[in-house]
C-alpha cells in the first residue's frame, strides 16, 4: 500500500480523533515519576532564578534596562514554566518520528484512517494543554508566594492569553519540523541539540532578550523562537505595552502560517521517503 494512500475514515470513528488530546496527559499519569521529575526541574530553576535576580539587583540598584526586580523574577518564572515543562515533556515522549523510524512502527502513521499530520496535530494540542496546566499551576503558586506579579491590567492579561496561544502553535510547529528531519537523517540527535539550544537562547527562556545588545535583540526578536516565550511574557510583565502589541501578535500569527506551510511540505516529502533502520 502506498504511504500516500490512506483508508477512508469511517463516519462513526471520525469524531474519536479528539481522544488523542488525552494521550499525553494519560501517558504522564501512567508514569508518575515523570511528573515528579518535571516538577523538580521547574522548582529548581525557579529557585535559582530568584536567587540570581535578587543578588543582581542588590548590587545594581532598582532597575536594569527598564526592568525592576519584580518584573525580572516574574519574567524568569513564567519563561521557565512555559519552556521547561514543554521541553521536558517532549523529551520524555516516545511518540516521535525518530523513535518510530528506529523500530519501524512509523509505517502505522501513514496507514491509519487518520492522517499522520492530523495525528501529530491532535497529539500536539494535548501536549500544549498539558503544558498549560503546568503553567497555570505554577502561576497560581507563584502569585500566592509573591514571586510572580499580576499583569498590569486586564487588557494586558487578555492579550497575553492570545499571544500565549499563538506561541504554543509556533512551539509545536518548530518541534514538529525538527522531528520530521528524522526522515532525511540517520539520527536527529544533532538537530535536536541545536534546536534545543536555539530555543533556549533565542526565545528568552534562559536570559530575557531585553538584556542582550541591541543588534542581537533586534535579530532574535523577529525569529520564531521569540514568539514562543519572549513575546507573551513581555506582554504579561508590561514590558510590551498593550497599545503596541498588534505588530507582535501579527508576527506571531505570520510565523504560525509560515511554519505550518513548511511543515505540510515536509510531510508530503516524508511520505515519499521512508527509511526504517530496522530493515
Identify the residue ranges that each predicted region occupies.
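Hydrophobic transmembrane alpha-helices and immediately adjacent juxtamembrane helices
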Residues: 1-279
Amino acid at each position: 500500500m502506498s504511504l500516500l494512500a490512506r483508508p477512508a475514515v469511517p463516519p462513526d470513528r471520525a469524531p474519536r480523533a479528539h481522544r488523542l488530546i488525552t494521550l499525553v496527559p494519560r501517558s504522564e499519569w501512567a508514569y508518575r515519576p515523570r511528573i515528579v521529575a518535571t516538577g523538580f526541574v521547574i522548582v529548581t530553576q525557579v529557585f535559582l532564578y530568584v536567587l540570581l535576580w535578587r543578588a543582581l539587583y542588590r548590587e545594581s540598584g532598582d532597575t536594569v534596562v527598564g526592568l525592576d526586580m519584580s518584573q525580572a523574577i516574574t519574567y524568569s518564572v513564567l519563561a521557565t514554566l512555559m519552556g521547561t515543562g514543554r521541553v521536558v515533556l517532549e523529551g520524555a515522549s516516545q511518540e516521535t518520528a525518530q523513535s518510530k523510524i528506529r523500530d519501524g512502527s512509523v509505517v502505522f502513521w501513514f496507514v491509519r484512517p487518520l492522517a499522520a499530520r492530523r495525528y501529530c496535530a491532535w497529539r500536539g494540542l494535548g501536549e500544549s494543554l498539558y503544558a498549560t496546566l503546568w503553567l497555570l499551576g505554577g502561576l497560581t503558586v507563584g502569585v500566592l508566594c509573591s514571586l510572580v506579579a499580576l499583569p498590569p491590567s486586564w487588557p494586558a492579561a487578555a492579550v497575553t492569553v492570545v499571544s500565549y496561544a499563538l506561541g504554543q502553535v509556533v512551539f509545536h510547529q518548530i518541534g514538529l519540523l525538527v522531528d520530521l528531519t528524522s526522515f532525511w537523517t540517520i539520527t536527529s540527535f544533532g538537530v535536536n541539540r541545536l534546536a534545543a539550544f536555539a530555543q533556549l537562547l533565542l526565545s528568552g527562556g534562559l536570559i530575557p532578550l531585553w538584556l542582550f545588545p541591541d543588534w542581537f535583540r533586534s535579530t532574535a526578536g523577529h525569529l520564531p523562537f521569540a514568539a514562543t516565550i519572549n513575546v507573551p511574557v513581555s506582554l504579561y510583565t508590561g514590558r510590551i505595552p498593550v497599545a503596541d502589541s498588534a505588530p507582535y501578535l501579527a508576527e506571531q500569527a505570520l510565523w504560525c502560517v509560515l511554519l505550518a506551510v513548511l511543515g505540510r511540505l515536509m510531510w508530503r516529502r516524508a511520505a515519499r521517503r521512508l527509511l526504517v533502520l530496522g530493515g
